[in-house]
């Protein structure tokens, strides 16, 4: 196990490299000399957790385990998310019940609203509208993944954003890019 600042890696000869967040509650199971993440924390190596099975076999096994509520959550997108969220206004939220500044948490923290839709609504597709910087966005993504790794079946978050590569893209969509994106005419005319 290779410990890093906020996560651990397990490199395996002849097997998959696993990354996990120690604080998520996910345990590591061993079978035939290989390590696997116990994503649903049941102490059993289930088919969907076993990377030796095909993607189709794993997906079928996972689908059988999901409740109707979990399936519905996987079919939905979040509202627009700012990273970090504002303390007032349309994209506002709290952090441990207070503003981000008052909470003392880093700008990459997962907001209360985000925790709620991930935990209670089972959402895993998150639409990002504004980020402070590429570094904060990457750290926030890692924090989101750490949070959901300890929920339900351990399904990760899919992060996406509205189109950002148009020459006429609005400032809020490009605010956190640091100017390091390619700009293309819109529409491309293909």
Language-model segments: which ranges?
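N-terminal beta-rich core of secreted/periplasmic extracellular enzymes
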Residues: 2-190
């Amino acid at each position: 196990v290779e410990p890093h600042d906020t996560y651990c890696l397990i490199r395996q000869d002849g097997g998959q490299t696993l990354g996990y967040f120690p604080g998520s509650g996910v345990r590591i199971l061993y079978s035939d000399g290989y390590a696997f993440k116990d994503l649903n924390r049941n102490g059993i190596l289930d088919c969907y957790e076993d990377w030796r099975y095909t993607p189709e076999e794993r997906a079928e096994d996972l689908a059988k385990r999901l409740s109707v509520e979990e399936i519905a959550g996987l079919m939905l997108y979040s509202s627009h998310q700012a990273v970090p969220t504002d303390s007032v206004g349309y994209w506002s939220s709290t952090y441990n019940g207070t503003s981000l500044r008052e909470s003392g948490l880093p700008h990459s923290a997962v907001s209360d609203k985000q925790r709620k839709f991930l935990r209670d609504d089972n959402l895993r597709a998150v639409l990002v509208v504004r980020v402070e910087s590429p570094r904060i966005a990457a750290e926030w993504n890692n924090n989101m993944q750490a949070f959901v790794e300890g929920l339900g079946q351990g399904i990760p978050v899919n992060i996406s954003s509205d189109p950002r590569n148009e020459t006429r893209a609005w400032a809020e969509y490009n605010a956190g890019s640091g100017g390091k994106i390619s700009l293309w005419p819109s529409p491309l005319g293909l």
